[in-house]
Swiss-Prot record:
Part of the ribosomal stalk of the 50S ribosomal subunit. The N-terminus interacts with L11 and the large rRNA to form the base of the stalk. The C-terminus forms an elongated spine to which L12 dimers bind in a sequential fashion forming a multimeric L10(L12)X complex. InterPro entries: Ribosomal_uL10, Ribosomal_uL10-like_sf, Ribosomal_uL10_bac, Ribosomal_uL10_bac_type, Ribosomal_uL10_CS_bac. It comes from the Bacteria. Forms part of the ribosomal stalk, playing a central role in the interaction of the ribosome with GTP-bound translation factors. The keyword Magnesium does not apply. Belongs to the universal ribosomal protein uL10 family. It comes from Geobacter sulfurreducens (strain ATCC 51573 / DSM 12127 / PCA). The gene is rplJ. GO terms for molecular function: large ribosomal subunit rRNA binding; structural constituent of ribosome. This is Large ribosomal subunit protein uL10.
Amino acid sequence: MNKETKQQQVAELHDKLQRAKAVFLADFRGMNVEQATTLRNELRSAAVEYKVVKNTLLELASRDTDKESLSQHFAGPTAIALSYDDPVSAAKVLSKFAKTQPNTFKLKAGVLTGKAISVADIQSLADLPSREVLIAKLLGTINAPVANFVGVLAAVPGSFVRALNAIKVQKEGN
């Protein structure tokens, strides 16, 4: 690769690192093509970009970004997974793949919204429910008191009508 190509790659990678909500690093030593293709397809379906990048280019690209703390992990074969939208789904795919391929794919570290996270943190992130499920639970929690209040308000007139009806039936019976 000539110098201009490297500079262009560094600039593109720098832009991607700045836009990414989460970045995960992995060691892919010993992976075969079939395994790599499977991982790429799973990550693509989760809207995650996966690249194998030279460590020196990655170190240059990470400068002046909130992902610069990852530079201590730029050793050996390094793959980078960039999540621009949902970090939980990216962590789920990577964590699951690391469990199924423990000898060939190992997570190194990550950055989530500017903060460095360990492999254990990535696993914890993977154990979270998806964003949609969390939003649904939150909305259900917010909606529950309102629904109960409406039920109570509806019960008061209903009770009043039933009481009036009982009085009417009692008077008609006499």
